C-alpha cells in the first residue's frame, strides 16, 4: 500500500471512530425481559416434564444429555429447591457452555445489577424469595456472544412458590440478553 493510500485509510478510520461519542463504549441493543416459568423437580416427576430453563431463549425445557438449559431444578427431602447449573447435570459439555450461580442478598425487585466477581459452578439450595444470579457463558459456535467482547449473559431468578405434592416450582426471572451487560432494570441497559 502506498503512503498516500495508507494515510487516507487512517483518516477514514479515525473519522469513523470519532463520529460516535465514545468509540470504546459498547451499547446494549435489547431490553431486559421479565418472565415467570413453571418447572418440575428432576426427581419424582416424569422425564418428559420440563425441569430446566434456557434463559436466553426464555423457555422451559426437558433436562437431558443435550444440555439445552442453563439451570435445572429439584426438590430435596426437606422441601427446599436445589438449583443446578448445566455442568452439574450434564458432564460432557464443552468449555464454552458453563453457567455460574451466585446468591445475592436483598429482595428480588431491589437487585438491579448482577454483581461482579466469582460465580460458583456448584448447586445452590434456595428458599422461596431468595435471589440467585446466573452468569451464562454464550460464546460457542453460533451462540449469542460468539463474537462479543464478553461471553456472558446475566439472569436473576427467585423461587416464587413450590408444590410438594405435584413437585412443581414457579420461578421468576429477569434476563439481560446483551452480552456482558449486567442490568436488571427495565428497558435497554446502559451498564
Listing of model-derived features with the role each one plays in the protein:
Residues 20-191:
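Surface-exposed, beta-sheet-biased, low-hydrophobicity segments with strongly acidic/polar composition
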Residues 1-20:
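Sec-dependent bacterial lipoprotein signal peptides
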Amino acid at each position: 500500500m502506498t503512503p498516500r493510500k495508507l494515510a487516507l485509510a487512517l483518516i477514514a478510520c479515525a473519522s469513523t471512530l470519532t463520529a460516535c461519542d465514545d468509540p470504546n463504549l459498547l451499547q446494549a441493543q435489547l431490553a431486559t425481559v421479565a418472565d415467570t416459568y413453571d418447572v418440575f423437580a428432576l426427581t419424582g416427576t416424569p422425564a418428559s416434564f420440563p425441569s430446566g430453563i434456557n434463559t436466553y431463549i426464555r423457555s422451559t425445557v426437558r433436562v437431558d444429555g443435550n444440555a439445552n438449559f442453563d439451570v435445572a431444578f429439584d426438590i430435596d427431602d426437606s422441601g427446599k429447591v436445589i438449583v443446578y447449573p448445566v455442568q452439574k447435570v450434564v458432564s460432557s459439555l464443552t468449555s464454552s457452555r458453563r453457567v455460574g450461580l451466585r446468591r445475592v442478598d436483598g429482595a428480588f425487585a431491589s437487585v438491579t445489577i448482577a454483581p461482579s466477581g466469582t460465580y460458583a459452578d456448584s448447586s445452590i439450595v434456595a428458599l422461596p424469595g431468595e435471589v440467585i444470579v446466573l452468569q451464562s457463558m454464550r460464546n460457542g459456535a453460533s451462540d449469542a456472544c460468539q463474537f462479543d467482547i464478553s461471553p456472558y449473559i446475566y439472569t436473576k431468578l427467585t423461587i416464587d412458590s413450590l408444590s410438594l405434592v405435584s413437585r412443581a416450582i414457579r420461578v421468576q426471572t429477569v434476563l439481560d440478553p446483551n452480552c456482558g451487560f449486567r442490568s436488571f432494570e427495565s428497558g435497554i441497559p446502559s451498564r
